[in-house]
Amino acid sequence: MVNPSKLKVDSVADVIAAAKAEPGKIDIAHAGVGNPFHLAAVLFQQAAGVKLNEIPYRGAAPAVQDVLAGIVPMMFVDYATARSHIASGALKALGVAALEERKELPGVPPIAATPDLAGFEAWPWQGIVAPAKTPPEIIAKLRETYVAAVSDPVVRQKLIEAGTEPMQSTPQEFSDYRRKEAAKWADAVKKAGIALD
């Protein structure tokens, strides 16, 4: 998202063009080193081949406040945090870090639709896990209960309103996805030289 009064861009491609014109000069806020919003910004810079000036904050709330105030022009942030600011027009959503357009942000394209950013995804995910030696029949029962819960229209709608899209993968699919994500993020962190203080 961006503060439209501070950064005159209409698309992710515009951000990339501006960043290439002035490497390291455009500020981007994040909610602290290693935070998902920070890592999304890192992955974006790597994928787009640009350098932004990262401004760390102690959490999303103060970062969003400074983007609203125009102190920093943009940041990656979750939908639940940005929803009211986007709805009011104070902030502009340029793209979503999911592979497809999100129902809660109609008309906002996925960043992956930007030329040269196919496959870009930095969407936070959550999952339900159990101890490694949990019997398969218990895992099956847990999954059955979970699927029933997220299939309930009221529960599903509440999750979507909070910016979470409930998925119903199998335990193996989720395990494969977690491994793929862990490798992607480990590579991004290593390339960026990120270390916690």
Q: Residues of each region from the PLM?
A:
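An extracytoplasmic/periplasmic, membrane-proximal ligand-sensing/linker region
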Residues: 46-50, 87-88, 136-197
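Phosphate-coordinating loops and pocket residues in cytosolic domains that bind phosphorylated ligands
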Residues: 17, 69, 113, 122, ...
